[in-house]
Amino acid sequence: PLPLMSAPQHIYIGTDSGATTSKINAVWDNEEPVSKKVFQRPTNSQNGTEAVINGWIESVNIFLKDHNLTWAQVDGVGLAIPGPYQRYGVLDRSANLPLSFAGWDVHEDYSRALAKAAGRPVPLVMGNDGQFGGVAEARYARKDTKHSVLMLMPGSGLGCAYIDQNGLPIPGDTLASMEGAHMPAPLQMLGNIKP
């Protein structure tokens, strides 16, 4: 008799989109990382929303190929992207993204692109990049304790997250978590900067 072949392990893809760089990685269904190296590419937000979506899909395809994985193994995708949001899945005006991105239903567009690439619907969950990063890092920082965690993540802005004692974030009214930067500033009061 032929030896029993084990079924391929399933994965969950993470897409972390910043204003300038997007990152891709994945975890196995046992929550272990597929790779300890994050795959990074330019976001290309200056080229519009379609270019961003196409870049994410191309990046996922490269990641899958580089790790001998297939779309059939992808059980879900998470998208971390800066806020604020008009509502779940729809971006609002963000200081570090083009004005044309306000009102973009990124959840709908990415869901459609994922389904086309996979040949079937792929569950997609999205949220604020600071919030998602905070939940992940708090899990490691807290270990088995019941402490709250405040996380500050500098990038093109300052992503922030407060994670409560139960490991849950505070999303806020605009689902932007505790976005700590990209706030209006009186430039004339910051030294030699003219408004």
Residue ranges and their predicted role:
Residues A7-I11, N25-D29, P33-T49, A102, ...:
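Glycine/GP-enriched mid-protein hinge/lid loop-to-helix segment characteristic of carbohydrate kinases
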Residues T20:
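Conserved Rossmann-like nucleotide-cofactor binding loop
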Residues D16, G78-P82, G127, L150-G157, ...:
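Short beta-strand segments
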Residues K65-N68, G119, G167:
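Short, flexible coil/linker elements and helix-boundary hinge sites characteristic
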Residues N25, I57-K65, V106-R112:
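Short, well-ordered amphipathic alpha-helices
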Residues P33-A72:
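N-terminal phosphate-binding loop and adjacent alpha-helix
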Residues P1-L4:
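Short, Lys/Arg-enriched N-terminal segments with co-localized hydrophobic residues
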Residues S45-N54, Q73-G76, G83-L150, Q188:
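Glycine-rich phosphate-binding loop and adjoining helix at the ATP-binding site
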